């Protein structure tokens, strides 16, 4: 069977997916985009609390960080997580950010975990000496590596740093563009999306007040993020149906009422931007 994902389709190209899926209302709200959350945003909650809050926010896609879902060989633990998510019709869109080095066996443990958990995208910070290993692993498991930029001073600070790193490697080694960190690196997030193109498998929707290393996070669109422009660019490059499109809001993790209110504001702005992009 050829799935929407394997055919390179996008949610907004395939109305039958929307009609058949329990995620219909959420997908329609966000213009057909599979918007979810990076669970690091909810690190002030335990894993069960993070899942519950994600559900209450009306989101069906979650990108876990290891603090909520540690990498494990234990199938029982993975199955327990799967059951929790299945009850809410939720999907793990990605896991990370995970480090990779030259140790192939250690790298493979992450892929084995991802395969067990049904995770298609691994957000990653791979060392330069990891790429030969990763070429073999993405081919063996058919799971993507999405290189995450961490802002000024990091390995993949600028757009060109990432593009140079993946040159000549398996196309399943691509990118998770943290748009907030690109703002800190004085890069234009919309240009980032266009340049990374069909190797873009993940997005961290994030905004910062200033284009410099030390700054603070703000509600989407209140800093330097052109929210409608981001979604127009994602439509242009045909962001994949099984990619990870995650809101990441890092402020006030332990002030739960403020955190959830701010996340709600970000999601409302994202929905508005996504619908504007859909309308052209």
Question: What would you call each of these model-derived segments?
Answer:
Residues 1-34, 43-57, 162, 166-177, ...:
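Histidine-acidic metal/acid-base catalytic patches
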Residues 4-12, 27, 48-51, 68, ...:
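Active-site acidic/histidine proton-transfer and metal-coordination neighborhood
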Residues 22-42, 78, 82-95:
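Mobile, glycine- and charge-enriched loop segments
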Residues 32-39, 61-63, 89-94, 120-121, ...:
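Structural preference for beta-strand elements that scaffold enzyme active sites
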Residues 42, 66-72, 100, 252:
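Short active-site-proximal "capping" loops at secondary-structure junctions
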Residues 43, 74, 103-104, 127, ...:
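A conditional alpha-helix N-cap/helix-loop micro-motif detector
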Residues 63-86:
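Glycine-rich, proline-tolerant flexible connector loops at the mouths of alpha/beta enzymes
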Residues 65, 98, 125, 206, ...:
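Conserved residues at the C-terminal ends of beta-strands
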